[in-house]
């Protein structure tokens, strides 16, 4: 069955396969399996699938990379990844307030509860601006931050907010 699945997946459009990988990465984040998410990220990079994503999903993928490394407590690497993410955003147009806020957090020195509360507050304020509201629909970032503040499982918080 597994070999038949590989054949079927290999026959799909590479951009669709990349999208599927991003969806599975999100579910790995959601269910607290960051090691598996990192394996998928590395596989996507090795196969060049990250280059098959459109601009929007590439931004989402890059944000997931930051989130996974935060979950794994790879803080030194996180700073470099945040710098690379900001350069990518600047090359591809003007970064939104949402993107700048998250990149600034991941580039930061402190990831304690106060820094998370500050990030949550800033993003909550940004969420009320109509031009950036759509960014919160793709990534449940506020729930993810709440998960890190409270220590509750991410999936539990999503259920509490009746998301996914």
Locations of regions flagged by a protein language model:
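Amphipathic alpha-helical segments of tetratricopeptide repeats
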Residues: 1-10, 39-50, 83-94, 124-128
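Composition- and surface-driven signal marking solvent-exposed, interaction-prone regions
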Residues: 39-40, 56-58, 78-83
